Amino acid sequence: MAKGIRDKVVILGAGCSKFGERWDAEPADLMAEAFEECLADAGIEKNQIQAAWQSTGIDAFSVGPGAMPLSIALRLPYIPVTRLENYCASGTEAFRAATYAVASGACDIALAMGFEKLKDTGYGGLPQRSRGVT
């Protein structure tokens, strides 16, 4: 008998875009690159995904509003896509939400994707007020 989440959820696959100063790559290109690698690693088709979570650390930088950038870039079928924003913990939040969705039985296959493209923004770190500086 299952005692916890670890008995109800598995990670089917993972993917990552290439690191580096990729000035020529749009955010959608990087998301699609990681997604294709993830699908290949998992051995599934994108139409098997039943829900998705997109995470980004800070809304103000290059990704776009809401969860539409993920849905459009990956050409996901008509599934619920939720956007999460929680600074450096954003990826963990997306992973946790997808894990709980599967563990609860709300879906069988869920996608969690974290994304940032800060090099194009000139962003140099956390805003001053989040570091306690006034």
Language-model region placement:
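Active-site-proximal alpha-helical scaffold in enzymes
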Residues: 86-116
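Conserved "HGTGT" condensation-loop signature of ketosynthase/thiolase-family condensing enzymes
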Residues: 1-82, 103-104, 112-134
